[in-house]
Structures are given as structure tokens and as C-alpha cells.
Design a protein with these regions (language model features):
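Ligand-binding beta-strand-loop-alpha-helix segment within the catalytic cores
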Residues: 1-3
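A contiguous loop/helix-start segment that scaffolds small-molecule binding in enzyme catalytic cores
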Residues: 5, 78-148
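General beta-strand structural signal in soluble alpha/beta enzymes
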Residues: 7-9, 37-40, 57, 88, ...
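Pocket-edge structural micro-motifs
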Residues: 9, 66, 144
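Short, small-residue-enriched loops and turns at beta-alpha junctions
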Residues: 13-15, 118-119
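Class I SAM-dependent methyltransferase SAM-binding "motif I" and its flanking Rossmann-like core
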Residues: 14-82, 131, 148
């Protein structure tokens, strides 16, 4: 007791992260636990900045969604009908399904993987995106009527 420790994570420490689960477990066994969480720049903001693409403007709504939401889901399509952006996180398992589902629609798509890392990849070209390997640290930003 009385020792300090640190936990580091890749990604967003308090958004769909192991950090949140670990913190909850630690607080169950150590209710007096003191902790400090230092947030960095979240991945979707980093993608928007790296690509010079505004996430939302004016009355647009920003939705951050884990990619468990299926590409053909009515819920996803309802989200996409409103002005703003939907950012799907961790799209490594379903990226191509999203691309297939949204092909021919009037959406602005932007894919980002490993943002801020040496092997960062950003593209709005569906074919270039399809050629990428599955990447855990990946996201797909979808906007209706976007202005770049």
C-alpha cells in the first residue's frame, strides 16, 4: 500500500477502452483509490485535424458509435439522415461491409487508421481503404452533405 502506479493505453482512455473496465474493477477492491486520468486528443478529433475535415458545423450532431452497429442497421441509417457526422470506431472487422452498404449513397466517407502513429493512414478512396489490412485502431467518419 502507498505505492503509485501508472496505466497507459493506446486510444481514448475513457471511450470504449480497457481503462474504464480496469478502473471500475480497481474501485471495487480499493474504494479509496485516488486516480488521475490524463486525456490526450481523442482519435476522431485527431482524424478530423489530420485531414483538415470539420467533424460538425452549425447545427450538426456528432455521434461516436462502436462498430457493433451493423451497416444495414435502421438505427445507423436514421443517424445518417440527420446533419452531422457519425464516427464508427474499431471498424477493422466490418470496414468493407460499411463501404458496400454506403456505396452509391451521398455520404462523405473518411477512413483513418493508426492516427498519430508512424503508420497512419487516411483516405476517402474506397478502393484504397479496401486494400488495407484489418487495423484495430481504425475508424470511419461518415457525413451527409459534408463540406471539405
Amino acid at each position: 500500500m502507498g505505492n503509485d502506479c501508472a496505466f497507459t493505453t493506446i486510444g481514448d482512455p475513457m471511450t470504449y477502452s480497457t481503462c474504464g473496465y480496469l478502473l471500475r474493477a480497481l474501485r471495487r477492491v480499493l474504494p479509496e483509490l485516488e486516480c488521475e486520468i490524463v486525456a490526450g486528443v481523442n482519435s476522431w478529433s485527431a482524424l478530423a485535424a489530420a485531414s483538415a475535415s470539420p467533424l460538425v458545423e452549425d447545427n450538426g450532431v456528432l455521434r461516436i458509435v462502436p462498430s457493433y452497429l451493423r451497416p444495414d442497421s435502421p438505427e445507423l441509417h436514421r443517424m445518417l439522415e440527420t446533419e452531422g457526422a457519425v464516427v464508427l470506431l474499431k471498424t477493422y472487422r466490418s470496414r468493407n461491409e460499411y463501404l458496400d452498404s454506403l456505396a452509391g449513397e451521398e455520404y462523405d466517407l473518411l477512413y483513418g487508421a493508426n492516427i498519430g502513429l508512424e503508420n497512419e493512414f487516411i483516405s476517402s478512396d474506397p478502393e484504397a481503404i479496401r486494400e488495407r489490412p484489418d487495423e484495430y485502431l481504425s475508424m470511419l467518419m461518415i457525413r451527409k452533405g459534408a463540406r471539405r
